[in-house]
């Protein structure tokens, strides 16, 4: 049984008669102890879909789904009180920018202990010791003294470690990490990902890694979900997708990586940008940018089809093992 079950999730903004479909009928599941990577450019709907799961989409946003379940609970039907008890305790999220996610007016220790107090209670000394243990667990040196510092006194990497400590304070079953390495240097990025995977294995929690960097999740994730313009365009085993993508967009993301560069002088890029509300093309949303697009692609939206190898691809002409479209 899946821990998280998402079926035809949509998030719309703006006028109901002509909404902007930030997330458009996406479906996926996450099992206990599984690492899932959600990949795509900025504007693909990765973060919005996760905010919808957390119940953090405010008006004028509208969340619709045929099924949105966590651990057997229908997230669309639970009360606000039930959701508050769930979020932060059983489901937690690490946001993109730790420097703006932490409250600058309160010490690091107060913010961690507040999360523990809300969901687990306990006396002040117990909460303080738990906060020290958490900071030690995420690799912050001299954790007892760091409880009394303010966010502005920490580096970006240390701030992100504090955010991770807050997220795992109540031992969640599902942790969503939204671009957890944004604005960090390459060395710190590797340390943060290594830390998240170490915690995931130790606690046997499900981990959803949201990123624009396919290489970041290729080795860490069991399964990869590729999103484009609010839609899922490819899903499947991480190793298989990394070595033989079935969708042109996934192929383009891979070709932009240095290790896949065919031209050693210049990295490949996909021309154009992710379409917004007013420039969404007919047919396949990728067709203006796709080198393989045909008249059929420009007229008819493809379905997300199950392929023979168990993967899914939203393409009329899924790529073969050699990277060529099956025209």
From Swiss-Prot:
It catalyses: a dipeptide(out) + ATP + H2O = a dipeptide(in) + ADP + phosphate + H(+). ATP binds at residues 40-47. GO terms for cellular component: ATP-binding cassette (ABC) transporter complex, substrate-binding subunit-containing; membrane; plasma membrane. GO terms for molecular function: 4 iron, 4 sulfur cluster binding; ATP binding; ATP hydrolysis activity; heme transmembrane transporter activity. Disruption phenotype: Inactivation of the gene abolishes use of heme as an iron source. One of its GO terms (biological process) is heme transmembrane transport. Its EC number is 7.4.2.9. Pfam families: ABC_tran, oligo_HPY. It is an enzyme of class 7 (translocase). SUPFAM superfamilies: P-loop containing nucleoside triphosphate hydrolases (SSF52540). It is a peripheral membrane protein. Part of the ABC transporter DppABCDF involved in dipeptide transport. Responsible for energy coupling to the transport system. This is Dipeptide transport ATP-binding protein DppD. It comes from Escherichia coli (strain K12). The gene is dppD.
């Amino acid at each position: 049984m899946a821990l998280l079950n998402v079926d035809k999730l949509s998030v719309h903004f703006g006028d109901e008669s002509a909404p902007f479909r930030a997330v458009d009928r996406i479906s996926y599941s996450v099992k206990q102890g599984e690492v899932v990577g959600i990949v795509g450019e900025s504007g693909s709907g990765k973060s919005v879909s996760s905010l919808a799961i957390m119940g953090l989409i405010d008006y004028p946003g509208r969340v619709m789904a045929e099924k949105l379940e966590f651990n057997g609970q229908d997230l669309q039907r639970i009360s606000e009180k039930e959701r508050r008890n769930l979020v932060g305790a059983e489901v937690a999220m690490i946001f993109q920018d730790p420097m703006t996610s932490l409250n600058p007016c309160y010490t690091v220790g107060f913010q961690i202990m507040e999360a523990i107090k809300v969901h687990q209670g306990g006396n002040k000394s117990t909460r303080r010791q738990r906060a020290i243990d958490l900071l030690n667990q995420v690799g912050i040196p001299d954790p007892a003294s760091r409880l009394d510092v303010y966010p502005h006194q920490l580096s970006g990497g240390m701030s992100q470690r504090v955010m991770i400590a807050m997220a795992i304070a109540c031992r969640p079953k599902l942790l969503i990490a939204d671009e957890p390495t944004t604005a960090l240097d390459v060395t710190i990025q590797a340390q943060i990902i290594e830390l998240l995977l170490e915690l995931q294995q130790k606690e046997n929690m499900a981990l959803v890694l949201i990123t624009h960097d396919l290489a970041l999740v290729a080795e860490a994730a069991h399964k990869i979900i590729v999103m484009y313009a609010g839609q899922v365009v490819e899903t499947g085993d991480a190793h298989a997708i990394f070595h033989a993508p079935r969708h042109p967009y996934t192929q383009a993301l891979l070709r932009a990586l240095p290790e896949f560069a065919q031209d050693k002088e210049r990295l490949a890029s996909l021309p154009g940008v992710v379409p917004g509300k007013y420039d969404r093309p007919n047919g396949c949303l990728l067709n203006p940018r796709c080198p393989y697009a045909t008249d059929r692609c420009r007229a008819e939206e493809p379905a997300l089809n199950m392929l023979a190898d168990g993967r899914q691809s939203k393409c009329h002409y899924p790529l073969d093992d050699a990277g060529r479209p099956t025209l």
